[in-house]
């Protein structure tokens, strides 16, 4: 469940900014039909930063309800404060989630020792499998391979979503961690290269609107068939890039609406609607990818 194509699911909202159950159910069914391996609920792409903790919990629980055991659900549980991350993680322990994705604290920029103590405390006070999440471009701090290696010795810290886009990282981490520690890409544009170097999958933004294609890329890659994997990935390269012309999830929500997966591409401030110039690039990318637009 923690290998292959895992979608970093968008959070569909109605025009008033409230959660749209109908669109969420449609998205979940789309991923089940496309054989996506698992769903990450309320990560960066799910707009965790603009949701209250009550909304955060309710959306994860609704996702579990709608998934109904048909696809594993991973809950985003990262927080700036260690006590809050522990509390949120414990909230999901009896919920049925398959595991948690825990981003490094952001804005307060802890040292490597601070990061180690943060994740150590979460591990020692909770039971769910934990996937570390390193995305320095957003958080302002970088979880270095040596710190990852120390954390890999905790039994419930099972892997890392590495979203630096730096492919040299995978070699450094692989040399230092135990052999069963999962290495998952968090960067669609370099995910295939990441897997060729020994990674086990990707937590993907692109999968929101190209679920079948991302599943096929990962499936081929994990079998060692990089010829077929690259053939599909080549069609998606413009899309991988276009989805980050503006901050995620602005572009991907607009495209999800464009192809009929959600009713509205509503975002909460300070996120604002996609620019006309970006729409042009997204339409070009979706045409090149040969994905159907409704």
UniProtKB/Swiss-Prot annotation:
GO MF annotation, one: 4-hydroxy-tetrahydrodipicolinate synthase activity
Coiled coil listed as a keyword: no
EC number of the protein: 4.3.3.7
UniProt-annotated site: Part of a proton relay during catalysis, residues: 44, 107
BP GO terms, sorted: diaminopimelate biosynthetic process; lysine biosynthetic process via diaminopimelate
SUPFAM superfamilies assigned to the protein according to its UniProt record, in alphabetical order: Aldolase
A GO CC annotation given for this chain: cytosol
Catalytic activity line of the entry: L-aspartate 4-semialdehyde + pyruvate = (2S,4S)-4-hydroxy-2,3,4,5-tetrahydrodipicolinate + H2O + H(+)
Pathway as given in its UniProt record: Amino-acid biosynthesis; L-lysine biosynthesis via DAP pathway; (S)-tetrahydrodipicolinate from L-aspartate: step 3/4
Domain of life: Bacteria
UniProt-annotated binding residues for pyruvate: 45, 203
UniProt keywords, alphabetically: Amino-acid biosynthesis, Cytoplasm, Diaminopimelate biosynthesis, Lyase, Lysine biosynthesis, Schiff base
Subcellular location: Cytoplasm
Active site, per annotation: 133, 161
Chief subcellular location: cytoplasm
Keyword Cytoplasm in annotation: yes
Catalytic EC class: lyase
Function description: Catalyzes the condensation of (S)-aspartate-beta-semialdehyde [(S)-ASA] and pyruvate to 4-hydroxy-tetrahydrodipicolinate (HTPA).
Family: Belongs to the DapA family.
Quaternary data: Homotetramer; dimer of dimers.
Family matches, as PANTHER family: 4-HYDROXY-2-OXOGLUTARATE ALDOLASE, MITOCHONDRIAL, DIHYDRODIPICOLINATE SYNTHASE
Protein name: 4-hydroxy-tetrahydrodipicolinate synthase
Organism whose genome encodes this protein: Buchnera aphidicola subsp. Acyrthosiphon pisum (strain 5A)
Lineage of the organism: Bacteria, Pseudomonadati, Pseudomonadota, Gammaproteobacteria, Enterobacterales
UniProt gene name: dapA
